[in-house]
Amino acid sequence: MLSLYEKIKIRLIILFLLAALSFIGLFFIINYQLVSERAVKRADSRFELIQKNVGYFFKDIERSALTLKDSLYLLKNTEEIQRAVILKMEMMPFLDSVGLVLDDNKYYLFSRRANDKIVVYHQEQVNGPLVDESGRVIFADFNPSKRPWSVASDDSNNSWNPAYNCFDRPGKKCISFTLHINGKDHDLLAVDKIHVDLNWRYLNEYLDQISANDEVLFLKQGHEIIAKNQLAREKLIIYNSEGNYNIIDSVDTEYIEKTSAVPNNALFEIYFYYPGGNLLNASDKLFYLPFAFIIIVLLVVYLMTTRVFRRQFSEMTELVNTLAFLPDSTDQIEALKIREGDAKEIISIKNSIAEMKDAEIERSNKLLSLISYDQESGFIKNMAIIESNNNQYLAVGIIKLCGLEAVEAVFGVDERNKIVRKLCQRIAEKYAQCCDIVTFNADLYLLLCRENVQTFTRKIAMVNDFDSSFGYRNLRIHKSAICEPLQGENAWSYAEKLKLAISSIRDHMFSEFIFCDDAKLNEIEENIWIARNIRHAMEIGELFLVYQPIVDINTRAILGAEALCRWVSAERGIISPLKFITIAEDIGFINELGYQIIKTAMGEFRHFSQRASLKDDFLLHINVSPWQLNEPHFHERFTTIMKENGLKANSLCVEITETVIERINEHFYLNIEQLRKQGVRISIDDFGTGLSNLKRFYEINPDSIKVDSQFTGDIFGTAGKIVRIIFDLARYNRIPVIAEGVESEDVARELIKLGCVQAQGYLYQKPMPFSAWDKSGKLVKE
């Protein structure tokens, strides 16, 4: 026979299962429609992006062909033409081959082999055999005008050609873009026609990059599939009788099909298949949170209900049988109440347990008193006392004894304890009458001012009022205070603010008082936020580089550029580089940040220099902290990044930033020496503000020095003498000076008088990404 509790429990289980099944069914019906609609929207969005990317790819090929054409201007010698084409092909891995029809109708073919070696085939006579460099005949009676890339194209326009069989790669299709030389170009070029062939492997890899792992993407020309992404290469793709493609795999994935012509290139079609229709795979995981939440709520309600019933039936049964459980229920006041109908024996047991409970409370209060107050000083040890009393206070302060650990290490625990007792005695003498004093630990005390707030403020602001009591020079007192009313229940939050303020001066070597206002707290909090978030900011791309040109101060010709790091936070807006660079050095993050800046600067410089008209001696200046130069293998990593980007050492300048650090080690000078041997220039940034003393100046022997903007901006004031001294020093050592922060013509003229030849500043151009620079090599004026 089932008990009443068991019967109710069974009914609850049935009700819970019915509710859960109903909810699950309704959820999946609604969710399936939402998932399908969302999959279509995502497919449209993804396809739009892929259309643009594929269009950009073909546009890049066309631009590359034009770039190739530009490289052949004024070249008449066939050897020069060959070298120019090979050089360009080495920089364009997406091209498989390049063909030239010269103005004498002879044909040259530059073909990329499997090992990336570029092989040249040519004709000795018009329409004659096509031979390799050794004279071996590759194709007899080769007539360029009959090749598909020539036949299919209009002589007046540049155009893409349908896929055709490559003569030098049996079984492989070629796709060519043909460039016709017309008009004035015909007089400047020794070429009548150029065709470039796509690198199939590169195109396939590009489709892999722009598509997700679960998307099928391929390109079609006519009835030929000319390129596939990784998933398309793995799937079985069947062209059906309806003119569509079926994607066959082992799991019967449902795909949303999207097709269109390549933008501005109707010759090729894009086929895109986005996975959709699978509820478990396609649905956003966050969509299932409400479902999981309702199930959990139902389960919790069931467990709580059964627990309540179980407890009620248990108590009823136990009260009927025995009151033996009461000694184990000393904290359950409800169980000890005398109720009508209680037997005399039950009342006696409840009274006995109540007496035991009262005795326990008395012992607990005595114990709480012992653990809440320091028995020797009388100071409060437990903040719960302050919070529970919730008294009104007029101000709050904190006292920190620094250097106590050193005393203990040298003189022992007894001497340490002696100093702590003396400190507590002095604190009690000065503040006990007007403050509640809380001991956090032996060297940290919180003062909560009850009255006489002016006296309290005056006393706590006194510096060195404790120093003579200890007799140890390295012991120092750091104090801070907030002068505003507060309740005891909020005392802990004020204590945390004061601890934060004290932490900002923990390394100061003298006793100090810091008034803790909102501005100070905001500054400390911002520095902590920067330290915690700078790594994440670098990872998500909030840190980026801008470049300010360095110009000839007389002609204003651009001589180089300085890479400058900027941080625009989505949460806090623009973060000053003076702050986050300094903090990165303080927390040991400067090496990781510095290498990221070097990689980014060299990569962006490489891309910009390929498409811009820069002087041959253009110099990219990259700021490097002395902390980085203290690293053993800095020059090796710098060189590796330089070679990866194909840059020449004489196009780079390392600017050593003016950071004051405790020790310059032997690696600092070794790195400078190795970089200089390779041809990298060395400059001292912000000369005169930090690192640069005369000894280091001569040890580094820089190729140039930069005068900080704080000096140039005040050149007509007190800083003018410093600027003149710097220029005299540089002139004596025959070292060029670059003036930073030039913002007016008056300053520029004064610098010219001093012999300055290079400058940078907003007078010429503000810092901006290379993408915003004038590619002709001129300054950008807003």
From Swiss-Prot:
Its EC number is 3.1.4.52. GO terms for molecular function: cyclic-guanylate-specific phosphodiesterase activity. Gene3D superfamilies: EAL domain (3.20.20.450). Keywords: c-di-GMP, Cell membrane, Hydrolase, Membrane, Transmembrane, Transmembrane helix. It is found in: Cell membrane. It is an enzyme of class 3 (hydrolase). Disruption phenotype: Cells lacking this gene have a weak reduction in swarm size. The chain crosses the membrane at residues 12-32, 286-306. GO terms for cellular component: plasma membrane. Phosphodiesterase (PDE) that catalyzes the hydrolysis of cyclic-di-GMP (c-di-GMP) to 5'-pGpG. Overexpression reduces biofilm formation. Cyclic-di-GMP is a second messenger which controls cell surface-associated traits in bacteria. PANTHER family: CYCLIC DI-GMP PHOSPHODIESTERASE PDEB-RELATED, CYCLIC DI-GMP PHOSPHODIESTERASE PDEF. This is Probable cyclic di-GMP phosphodiesterase PdeI. It comes from Escherichia coli (strain K12).
